[in-house]
Amino acid sequence: VNKNLYYLISLSGAYDSQSFWRTKDIEKMDTVLNKPALDCIYTDCTDILGSLYFCSDDARTELEKRLAHIPVNALHFIDSGDYHYVSLLFLQRINQPFSLLLFDHHSDCMESAFGGGLLTCGSWVLHALENLPNLKKAVLVGPADEDKTAEQLLKDSRITWVTEAEFEQQKEALCKELSKWPVYISLDKDVLNKEEAVTDWSQGTMQLSQILCFLTDAKKSGAIFLGMDVCGEQKVSPEGFHLDEENGANLNSSTNEKIKFYQKDLTFSL
């Protein structure tokens, strides 16, 4: 098994303008198959209707079918934050008690703005807490204070809420918390500063190095990581590719490259 293997799930086509996943080293050959060795498996889901911001029942069924070949215990790049609900499709396959560690500038615990309990990019954590008995803890790092409006969330003992400002002083306590159950990591790049990511949503000011160092510390403290996903790409405008979008794509690609490189320090196990 290739431990560096990671998975790209294209929903908006944003990865087409990024270079981090393309094979640069022509010399790197698979000696058995005699062709370039790829570290990446690309799954195209751009044709699935009813998947932007919210996930219709039909879209969910189709996504579950297309993602069935992708193991939970791997690194997944899942496109723009508009599709962050894809995390739930991996979480629902975890068949043991676990914690969710979410780095995000938004809580993703909001009731669906579309009503009717619809699964959306802003409600998927709530869906997970309501429907997945194996999810014992959700550790949310980075949400803005105004996201705390949902009072019932603050009363839910399964949720640990840490703002950016609190993160450094809370790290030790979080490491202890994350050693209780195996952990699935979800990183929305909108938690990062604008020198490291360009997203479709309001952003925080965290640094990628802060997050990666914390994951290393958590692992040293006994955390077991099940898998990880990354979202927060900038969607390409329908009218075409502009210079600022090219700059954003290059920035996001560079950050994704660092995450991809870091994954060899993480061992995912189910």
Regions found by a protein language model. Give the residues of each.
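Hydrophobic alpha-helical segments and helix pairs
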Residues: D79-N131, K136
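Catalytic cores of soluble, metal-dependent hydrolases
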Residues: N2-I78, D82-S99, K137-L270
